[in-house]
């Protein structure tokens, strides 16, 4: 069986990482080989991005270029080979984050999408987690003690508005204020209904 690409999106603090790892563990435990991964990566371009989030020395256009370069490498060297080997990829952030985050900084959203056309792998399912902005910021502060420059209330409100506008049939909007198990169960039920994976063993 060829693998699948399942994407988790949403603002920082919405719980994507925890849900992604939980989902990956459940799939592996029922015999569906799965890998959790994330963007930006810790490879060259992703590391440059992580540095810039603290130093504030890149323009939105420069940030976008690094995100796309990192994503190209991620797809080429990790995501595509794993999918071809039959793995389910559970991906924390993808091109939709670039559209939302850089779009909220004024870069045309269609332009951002078009920059991906030549290399992107279309996801099988996208789950967009929505959470009250103040709750998300409080979670971030509790977890690491600071917020980076992508993480202020007004900006994240604009980002979430763009996330809320995504309405392709394979995209599903999730209330991330619920407990993690409830969120994961909702995602698993949607995967089961979509029939992209054999989840009949799940009750």
From Swiss-Prot:
Binding site residues for ATP: 10-17
Stored Pfam families: Thymidylate_kin
Keywords: ATP-binding, Kinase, Nucleotide biosynthesis, Nucleotide-binding, Transferase
GO CC annotations on file: cytoplasm
InterPro entries: P-loop_NTPase (IPR027417), Thymidylate_kin-like_dom (IPR039430), Thymidylate_kin_CS (IPR018095), Thymidylate_kinase (IPR018094)
Any Gene Ontology biological process: dTDP biosynthetic process
EC assignment: 2.7.4.9
One GO molecular-function entry: dTMP kinase activity
PROSITE patterns: THYMIDYLATE_KINASE
Catalytic function, reaction form: dTMP + ATP = dTDP + ADP
UniProt similarity note: Belongs to the thymidylate kinase family.
Function: Phosphorylation of dTMP to form dTDP in both de novo and salvage pathways of dTTP synthesis.
Protein name: Thymidylate kinase
UniProt source species: Brachyspira hyodysenteriae (strain ATCC 49526 / WA1)
Phylogenetic classification of the source organism: Bacteria, Pseudomonadati, Spirochaetota, Spirochaetia, Brachyspirales
Gene from which this protein is expressed: tmk
């Amino acid at each position: 069986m060829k693998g699948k690409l399942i994407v988790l999106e949403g603002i920082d603090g919405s719980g994507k990482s925890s849900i992604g790892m939980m989902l990956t563990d459940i799939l592996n435990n029922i015999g569906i080989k799965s890998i959790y991964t994330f963007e930006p990566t810790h490879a060259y371009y992703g590391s440059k991005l992580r540095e810039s989030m603290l130093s504030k020395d890149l323009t939105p256009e420069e940030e976008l270029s690094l995100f796309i370069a990192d994503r190209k490498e991620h797809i080429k060297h990790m995501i595509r080979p794993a999918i071809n080997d039959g793995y389910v990829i559970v991906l924390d952030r993808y091109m939709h984050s670039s559209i939302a985050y850089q779009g909220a900084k004024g870069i045309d959203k269609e332009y951002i999408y078009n920059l991906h056309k030549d290399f992107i792998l279309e996801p099988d399912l996208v789950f967009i987690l929505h959470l009250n902005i103040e709750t998300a910021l409080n979670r971030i502060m509790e977890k690491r003690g600071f917020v980076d420059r992508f993480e202020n209330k007004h900006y994240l409100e604009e980002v979430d508005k763009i996330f809320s506008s995504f309405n392709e049939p394979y995209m599903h909007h999730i209330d991330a204020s619920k407990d993690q198990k409830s969120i994961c169960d909702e995602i698993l039920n949607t995967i089961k209904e979509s029939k992209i994976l054999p989840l009949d063993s799940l009750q």
